[in-house]
Each structure stands twice: as C-alpha cells, then as structure tokens.
C-alpha cells in the first residue's frame, strides 16, 4: 500500500468538473515530466561505482534532499555542491571531477516514458506552460528532451523565488494575464505535494496531481508533507491524464 494514502487529506471533495473549463495547463517539470529520481540514482551509482553499490535508494534520496536544503540556490551549477554534500555524507568520492560529473548528469535527466507523447496530445487542446524551479539552462535541456512542447515557460532564476513561494505563482499569473488568460483558465499539473499541489490549491488554482510514486513507499527524492492536499484531478501517469483530458 502506498504510504501516501495512509495520511488524511486537508481538502474536501470537489464537484466533478470538465477539462473543457481550462485553456492553460501549467506544468511542474522536474519530477512530473522529467524522471529526476532515476537520474539522481543512476548518476550517483555510475560516478561512485562499488562505493555506492550497497546504498539503498532511500538513503541516497535522503542525503540528496539534505544537500538541496543546504544549497537551496536554483542555478543548475549548485548541483556541484549538492553532490559534494551527498558524497561526503555517504562516504563516496567527493573530488571536483565527481562533482562536475553529477552537475553535468543533471542536465541529461530524461523524461518519463509517457511524457513526450502525452504533451504532444495535450498541446492540441491546451496552451502548455512550464513552471519550474530549474534555471533556464536546465529547462532548455529538459524542454528539448520533451520535444519542445511549451508555449511559454517560467524559471526560478527569472522569478527570483522558487516554488512553493506564492510569488512564483503570482509571477506566472501576471505573465499569462498578458496573453489574455485568467486564473480560472489555468489547471496546474504537478507531482510534488510540497512544491506545487498544496500551495497552488491554497492560492485558488485547480490542480491535477500526477502521483508518479503511486504504489511506492515514501516520498523518494521529493520533500515530505505531513498532510496530503486532495487535488481536483488525480492520475498516476501523464498518459492517463492525457487520455482523460483529450481522449485516446
């Protein structure tokens, strides 16, 4: 049983709604469309070899999250320092070459297997906007890997803040309003309860939770939340979301 569903939700049931209510889909990128967890694990094990062979996924993720907390800057270059923190904590090689390798590996994180096709289908009906805590350098790599599906994008190095800061959402709201879209036109789509679903709901957005870890224990590489926010829509995959939103 997924431990997420053992916790209570802090929102009430919503009246069923149609996807036709929306014109804009705003997407979290890393974790929702890009499989950063596999990217982190593969990079750590490739760089460290036998030294990392006995480390569990959860142990690596725990050190990775502490490294992100210790180095909260949102430039892709900070991943050099995040890896050094992780490596020292886990007793792995922490030389400059290893840190450089991890930083470069971050820019090569790949999409989930269903992301590209789902976005291609969704773009036939909706305006697609990336809302990412990554910087512009990283997003350019991820967008290319995803087939360049976005009509617009907002990055943390442009907003000056990162999600879950409400100012990030305010920045995008203002940006989309310049194109004639209201908040009620927007459905926010994300995996992270911490960075996206909880705060977006509090700000009055309709939200779609892509629960990438459905059926898996714990929160993986994403920060934990004490209570889950109940979304307006809930799917385990982007394919299932696209099937519901635009049909098969």
Where are these regions (language model features)?
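Asp-based, Mg2+/Mn2+-dependent phosphohydrolase catalytic module
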Residues: 3-11, 15-25, 37-38, 97, ...
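N-terminal helical cap/lid subdomain that shapes the substrate entry/recognition surface
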Residues: 19-113, 124, 137-138
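Alpha-helical packing segments of well-folded alpha/beta enzyme cores
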Residues: 115-118
